[in-house]
Amino acid sequence: MIIRSAEFVISAVQPSQYPDTDLPEIAFAGRSNVGKSSMINLLVNRKNLVKTSSTPGKTRLINFFDINGQLMFVDLPGYGYAKVSRKEQKTWGPMVERYLSSRKTLRGLMLLMDLRREPREDEFLMMQWCAHYDIPWKMVLTKADKFKKTAADRRRHEIARAVGIGADEMILFSTLQKMGRDPALETIARMTGILEE
């Protein structure tokens, strides 16, 4: 799948603000500071399509991006950042679940997790939502450059056991090393039914 164009469309909170489009959508979810913005930027080969921030909890809206005029990437707000106010933490769940439950054009979700961390309640909640709403999902293990290859693979198997899926169903990803871009794009092409070029 070759990405030729990528444009920001809109930021939304409520379903009434979502773009009125029939394009298939792929959502990106994960903890604050896991690397969602960096992953999207690498996939589209643009440095600043999605603004990256060293401040966790910065993305508090649902951001929509038009890719090739063929599909949409949807950047969901990061979860689990303690310094975000309690009120904002409480709005995260309903905002994200509303999107997952109501968006008929949603074709799949990329669930990002830092390879250095253990899966927590929020990751399991996202997996439960995907199962409940029948959304195909793929786990992407970010920051893989922090490990040597064998250690990264060992961590992948440990996390796979913890979440109950096969290690080969996960993508090791590193923005710095440009690792995992092709497998991620292949997954997105499969989920959306867009033929690879």
Swiss-Prot record:
Which co-factor is required? Answer: Mg(2+)
Keywords from UniProt, A to Z, are: Cell cycle, Cell division, GTP-binding, Magnesium, Metal-binding, Nucleotide-binding, Septation
Annotated EngB-type G domain residues: 22-194
Give the UniProt record's GO annotations in the biological process aspect. division septum assembly
One Gene Ontology term of the molecular function aspect: metal ion binding
The source's superkingdom equals Bacteria
Q: Does the keyword GTP-binding apply?
A: yes
Q: Transmembrane residues, as ranges?
A: none
GO cellular component term, pick one = cytosol
| Residues reported to bind GTP | 30-37, 57-61, 75-78, 142-145, 173-175
InterPro entries reported for this sequence: G_ENGB_dom (IPR030393), GTP-bd (IPR006073), GTP-bd_ribosome_bio_YsxC (IPR019987), P-loop_NTPase (IPR027417)
Which amino acid positions bind Mg(2+), per UniProt?
37, 59
Q: Which PANTHER family match?
A: ENGB-TYPE G DOMAIN-CONTAINING PROTEIN, MSS1/TRME-RELATED GTP-BINDING PROTEIN
Q: Which family does it belong to?
A: Belongs to the TRAFAC class TrmE-Era-EngA-EngB-Septin-like GTPase superfamily. EngB GTPase family.
Entry function: Necessary for normal cell division and for the maintenance of normal septation.
What's this protein's name?
A: Probable GTP-binding protein EngB
Annotated organism of origin: Desulfosudis oleivorans (strain DSM 6200 / JCM 39069 / Hxd3) (Desulfococcus oleovorans)
Taxonomy of origin reads: Bacteria, Pseudomonadati, Thermodesulfobacteriota, Desulfobacteria, Desulfobacterales
Gene symbol of the encoding locus? engB
